[in-house]
Regions:
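Short beta-edge/loop segments at beta->alpha junctions of small alpha/beta modules
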Residues: 1-72, 108
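Structural motif detector for alpha-helix initiation sites
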Residues: 3, 18, 77, 141-142
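A residue-level signal for beta-strand positions that form part of recognition/binding surfaces
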Residues: 15, 111, 163
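A short, terminal or domain-edge coil/loop segment
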Residues: 15-17, 94-108, 142-156
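Hydrophobic/aromatic-lined pockets within catalytic cores
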Residues: 26, 85, 150-154
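Short coil/loop linkers at secondary-structure junctions
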Residues: 27-29, 87, 190
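Short gly/ser-rich loop at a beta-strand->alpha-helix junction or flexible surface loop bordering the NTP-binding
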Residues: 37, 43-52, 62-123
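Hydrophobic alpha-helical interaction segments
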Residues: 125-205
């Protein structure tokens, strides 16, 4: 098989796994992948996941990969809060939550961090369209906040929560308090309820 044949078949997927390759060509020689990576014709994303280097220049594609290389997962926590303008800092890692174990990956597209949650807490995310028509799974602002408070329990006092420097205008004018309350109830966590109460007190919600 030539690289051109391989690229023609798989390029539109954006990123792909070795399983997808074998589903297409059961007798595929995986040594080809090693050679093509060395030549710069492919990018290794993590074990058994790959992409074409042309996608390095595409907007939002680094976030799209986050959904694909560790599933099920959705983007949340600091990356989502930064996207919505709730926190002022630019986020280096692309942060997600998943029902799989906590993990971190690095590749040419960036650094990916996944925090583990129970399967019953995999809700509160929506498909967000990308420029090229693909979609990626992204937490709502309310779920991103609750995921953060749930997974980082040291945010339990006013001093710690104030260090997040959440945007006051967003908190008071755009945050959906009804949705926040609904999501909070689904966690069934007294500790999270206490942390959320402190947060609401700070921002007079």
């Amino acid at each position: 098989m030539t690289y051109l044949e391989f690229r023609t078949q798989l390029f539109d997927l954006g990123c792909f796994s070795i399983r997808q390759v074998y589903a297409w060509q059961p007798d595929f020689d995986r040594n080809n992948l090693t050679r093509w990576i060395k030549k710069g014709l492919l990018v290794r994303l993590r074990q058994e996941y790959f992409a074409f280097p042309e996608y390095l220049r595409r907007p939002d594609f680094a976030q799209y990969i986050a959904n694909r290389i560790y599933r099920p997962s959705y983007i949340s926590l600091h990356t989502a809060l930064s996207f919505y303008g709730l926190i002022p800092e630019a986020v280096v890692q692309i942060t997600s939550v998943s029902t799989l174990k906590t993990a971190t990956f690095r590749n040419p597209f960036g650094e990916y961090s996944y925090k583990s949650i129970k399967s019953g807490l995999m809700f509160g995310y929506e498909p967000r369209p990308m420029a090229d028509g693909r979609t990626l799974l992204f937490a709502t602002p309310e779920k991103a906040l609750l995921d953060l408070l749930y997974l980082y329990p040291f945010y339990d006092k006013e001093e710690e929560l104030e260090q997040l420097r959440l945007d006051e205008d967003y908190m008071q004018e755009e945050l959906d308090r009804e949705r926040l309350g609904e999501y909070l109830g689904r966690f069934r966590s007294k500790a999270l309820e206490k942390r959320t109460a402190v947060l609401m007190k700070i921002y007079e919600l």
